Amino acid sequence: MKKKFLVKKIITSALPYVNNQPHLGNIIGCVLSADMYARFCRKNNEDVVFLSGTDEYGTAIEMAAFAQNKTPLQICEENRIIHKKIYDWFNIDFDFFGHTTSTAHTKNVQDFFNKIHNNGFFTEQEIEQFFCDKCQIFLADRYVVGTCKFCKYTDAKGDQCDGCGHTYKSLDLIDAKCTLCHSFPNIKSTRHLFFDFNNFKDKLQKLFNTNSQYWSENGKQITKSWLDQELLPRCMTRDLKNRWGVPVPLKDFEEKVFYVWFDAVIGYFTFYKEYVAARSESKELDKNNVFATDNILQDCELVQFMGKDNVFFHTIVFPSLIFATNDSYPLIKKLSVTEFLLFENEKFSKSRGHGIFGLDLVDNTMGQSCLWRYYLAKIRPEKCDSNFSFTHFTNVIDADLNNNIGNFCNRVLKYIKNKNDKLISIDKLEHRDDLMVQTIDKIYKEYLTSFSAIRIREALEKILEISKVGNEYVQQVVSSKIEVPKGFQVAFSIVVLIGQLLEPFIPVSSEKLLKMCNRKKENFCESFYIIKSAEIGDDIKPLFNKLDDSLIERIKNFKK
């Protein structure tokens, strides 16, 4: 049998920018949410590739390198390791995790550009830009600081004022200075390549009309607001100090690089090609052939996860670039957009030291990753901004994991081990059992529907509902004093179901629970059913433990 390489779904997480380590908002905003959905799809017997990678070009990397007296590549290589360490701790199960500084990505971006350029969709324009005579470079927005013309804030950045929030061109700043040497720059002319998005407005509108039914509401609204206005041409090339970007393969533009958002979105296709090439075992699909063709991308469904600040680049920029190639690349089918996660009612800030960042957790001194995966799913900012609160965190872990799910599963398994010699043997179901099965099956199917629609919080709540119904059923059995052993054996099937349903959210805990049940991880079945015969494992112990006082103190006293 030939090995299958084509997949139905390519699930992507917006590429994390590698100038710094991710905080909790970054993690739930795209990477963790995409991981949960990918795990669900795999259990739902769908053909899936989940990929992402670090976004490593642009001025922010250059500035971080300058501040630390390192090269941009050093910054990327060091932080790439940090990112991967954090994602590994969170049990993010990528099928492929790449980086945009790879030679494969450079080639893919340049090939993509050549298609668009050959089709006549780039135009050359001469623009004026700040030029620092002392540094001998054109100054990108991040290399300029000055006084805001709107509010007179004296430390306004080159593209947006932190004082009043206005956006503007860097040339609009008063008394602009170079951030590298603090001298006053001159204004010089430079030629760049522009891409006119308005050429594709009709196609973008058609894409929106066709696929936005599968998009989260915030993604729809943000995209609609752009489509309701004229889409202006945007500069797709840059003059950067270290030429830190994908080089432009065009005569007279050899010293320029592509705008970081031009190359970043193409990264999804690069990483998929790298994924296929790495797994190819046939001469027909060797690495060179994979990168010479785009046929492997046909008939794939693109499902994309991101924060709301990245929507424009994925629903306007990315599809427009695809349209401009005149090739059959997959267009965004499903879109899941998160709002912002606050930390104790304020924005995360590395510079102000406010918030929990990935490296704060990887030593497990504030609990295992399953606790953090669960809580971040619980507060996932799906429809509006949500808030991380230490008090809420500890309350949720105790109420949901210990008192609800943990207590129910432990009660059932301990009874079967101690009172029934670890055995499940059921001949027929009672009327009460049939009613319970109907109730559980209804909630189970709601879980599947919610997760399929990427309503992740809603899916999580369905597990709690199932556990609650299980608790009530067991209590009814005990109170009735009728067929009590049989009742606990019936309840065992609910425990197994919970173990399967938890896997996308907290895979390590799911594995532990299924091991105690002596069951394997399985794909989702069509309906909930009662397991008539089974034998549970020997080592039955609480799935979760109460947060001890010292851990609660460490969490509540954490100051960033």
UniProtKB/Swiss-Prot annotation:
Domain of life: Eukaryota
Keyword set includes Methyltransferase: no
Enzyme Commission no: 6.1.1.10
Single Gene Ontology BP annotation: methionyl-tRNA aminoacylation
Binding residue positions for ATP: 350
Location in the cell: Cytoplasm
Principal location listed in the UniProt entry: cytoplasm
Leading EC class: ligase
GO CC annotation, single: aminoacyl-tRNA synthetase multienzyme complex
Motif ('KMSKS' region): 347-351
Keywords attached to this entry: Aminoacyl-tRNA synthetase, ATP-binding, Cytoplasm, Ligase, Nucleotide-binding, Protein biosynthesis
Gene Ontology MF terms in the entry: ATP binding; methionine-tRNA ligase activity
Catalytic activity: tRNA(Met) + L-methionine + ATP = L-methionyl-tRNA(Met) + AMP + diphosphate
Positions occupied by motif 'HIGH' region: 16-26
Record carries keyword Ligase: yes
Transmembrane segments: none
Matches recorded under PANTHER family: METHIONINE--TRNA LIGASE, METHIONINE--TRNA LIGASE, CYTOPLASMIC
Family: Belongs to the class-I aminoacyl-tRNA synthetase family.
Name assigned to this protein: Probable methionine--tRNA ligase, cytoplasmic
Organism annotation: Vairimorpha ceranae (strain BRL01)
